[in-house]
Amino acid sequence: MSMTTTRFAPSPTGYIHVGNLRTALMNYLIARKAGGTFILRIDDTDPERSKEEYVDAIKQDLDWLGLHWDRVERQSERLDRYAEAADKLRAMGRFYEAFETPTELDLKRKKQLNMGKPPVYDRAALALSEGEKEALRAERGNGVWRFKLDQERIEWTDGILGDISIDAASVSDPVLIRGDGQVLYTLASVVDDTDMGVTDVVRGSDHVTNTATQIQIMAALGFEHPRFAHHSLLTGPQGEALSKRLGTLALRDLREQGVQPMALLSLMARLGSSDPVELRSDMAELIEGFDVTRFGAAPTKFDVQDLFPLTGRYLQALPLEAVAKDVAAAGVPEDLAAPFWSMARENITTLNDLAGWWALCRDGAEPLIADEDRAFVTEAMALLPEGPLDADSWGAWTQAVKEATGRKGKGLFMPLRKAVTGMERGPEMATLLPLMQVIRARG
């Protein structure tokens, strides 16, 4: 095969989610590790459901994550190629028109299941005469076009699942063109993957049967099939199915919640593999450490909450320059940006938390004072050092309070922290105190 070429082929019928990302990321990393090509292919053959706003959103999500494509292809611009392939299959006797309604097909399936047989299309349409077909067209309109499978075993070595063998006799002849003329994914993908030189296809394990039929379609058209690898499907933390429509798992929603790209990518690049999840600092590290053969077939549990500790750890390592715009957007004056970030970085989960910490510094907090500590806090506030507060102020203040009240340890420090910040835990007080602009109002 030629240079490694992979593709991510979303349908622009909604926003992409973490399941889509897993597929996109694997294909991206394979291409980049091999020095190959990564194609973004928009599977927009369904004109009713495909929307340009979703195309834009897909590109925005991938760009946010740094999954930059080498070129974009659109299936809606390639309909002539699909028609050529369909004509070739017809000429070979591998394409036939079928007219059953959904209700009729459902009744056939139920009958087969009741008889203990697999629910496979019975190929009744192959027995129709030309006259019968004309009558059905007049009555029902154009039929669907099915690919006639060779009823033999279809075998390949999967990059994740290993050796696969599927009996084509247990699979229905796939519909490749609908009655309204719309070309379906199974045929369009075969033509595209060949024309675009795709060498490796990584997708979910729910596509295994689809892959088997596509291998036969490719062979019928004289195409060499690419290498296939089918990753496990994601489930929720309790093993429940994930829904594409579960909004909190859409990438755009994760972005709005403050999840950092490298936190998300670091998790998805290892989830379901035999390697532990490791937070990476950049894409180059992800590429270097990726190995598709390390992934397994078992369903993979995904918990969105795992993203937030990773995001926090990623942010802690960033210099001020990397977050200067975010710090400024939180309202922090430029001259306080450096000490503020030094304080906040250890105490945030996402950048969305910056505004809350600055509000504390700017406006103060509602004091948290136990009844038995009220007199102590009043006395302590009167001992606050004169002049601007700096890194030494906390030590000087607590020493003065200790000498005046006799308190020490937790009995000294905790009431002061709660009175100043309204919280039982948080940043080092020596770091936070110089940033507190209204603390003297408590005296």
From Swiss-Prot:
Presence of keyword Aminoacyl-tRNA synthetase: yes
Q: What is its main location?
A: cytoplasm
Q: Which reaction does it catalyse?
A: tRNA(Glu) + L-glutamate + ATP = L-glutamyl-tRNA(Glu) + AMP + diphosphate
Where the record places motif 'KMSKS' region is 241-245
InterPro entries annotated for this entry?
Answer: aa-tRNA-synth_I_codon-bd_sub2 (IPR020751), aa-tRNA-synth_I_CS (IPR001412), aa_tRNA-synth_I_cd-bd_sf (IPR008925), Glu-tRNA-ligase_bac/mito (IPR004527), Glu/Gln-tRNA-synth (IPR000924), Glu/Gln-tRNA-synth_Ib_cat-dom (IPR020058), GluQ/Sye (IPR049940), GluRS_core (IPR033910)
User: GO CC: one term?
Assistant: cytosol
Compartment(s) = Cytoplasm
One Pfam family here = tRNA-synt_1c
| Annotated binding of ATP, by residue | 244
Q: Spell out the subunit comment.
A: Monomer.
HAMAP family reported for this sequence: Glu_tRNA_synth_type1
Say which family it is in. Belongs to the class-I aminoacyl-tRNA synthetase family. Glutamate--tRNA ligase type 1 subfamily.
- What is the name of the protein in this document? Glutamate--tRNA ligase 1
Gene name of this polypeptide = gltX1
